[in-house]
Amino acid sequence: MWVERPGSRSFVFGGDEMQPLQHLRFLEAKKVGEPEVMLFGVPLEATESFRGGTRFAPRAIREASRSVESYSRIFGKDITQVPLADLGDVVLSGDVAGDLEQVAGLVRGWASDGKRVVMLGGEHTATLGVVRGILRVLNKLQVVVLDAHSDFREEYLGLSLSHATVCRRLCDMGVLVGVAGVRSFFGGEGEEFEGFLCQLEDLPSRLDPKRPLYLSIDLDALDPSLCPGVSNPEPGGISYAQVLELFRSLRRFDVVGLDVVEGCPPCDPSGATMVVAAKLVQEGIAAFWG
């Protein structure tokens, strides 16, 4: 059985509550004096419709990072040389709109100081708060999403802020550029979504080199034989090597943020999914900011 560890009191960071890490940090990242990359968790699990457990993922990714080397041979960088701070998890209230606004406020403060952000989810809805915060500072932003599902519903189960509406809301913000890895459609996406849907290798050609870029990775975009521990698995999918090749092709762009979401640790007793998630974060930091 997957159970939550006994909690401890929250502390205040920048006026907002964050959950202390009790000495568990991503790759042992410490709080540094002048960090350039801000890593934090959003253990959001509010609108999941199939398998629960996304709230455990931020901590599980950190635990899995203990098995990951900090050096990336692919990108020739060691992320211990990156000014990286793991700030813990946002303390959530249970009100999705309010929680997203809290995330947006935190990220806005970091973005206004020129920081890059890495968010560990939590359900995919958390991405909306991060993007909202960055957009308030940069005004112009382009977002690329890897996902097995279109996430293009106007609302789902009566909710407009849902894991099933993420791409729809990003489209409403005017920031969505491309979505790759989709194998599941609800049938009502329409021509508008067809304009965003593309193959993974075609994503870079859609991007504006003059606009900052945010990359959101829903782990269910990957092949479930590699990542079974997700909330809504779909057959087929992207390989780990393909994601790394995407990282390589995006290095020429100004990547301002990255997230890895929808991990569901209780659904993968082997822990392999969380290791993949930790590796993606490590390689992403090395590729974009190393």
Per-range role (PLM):
Residues 2-290:
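Conserved alpha-helical scaffold segments that buttress catalytic/binding sites
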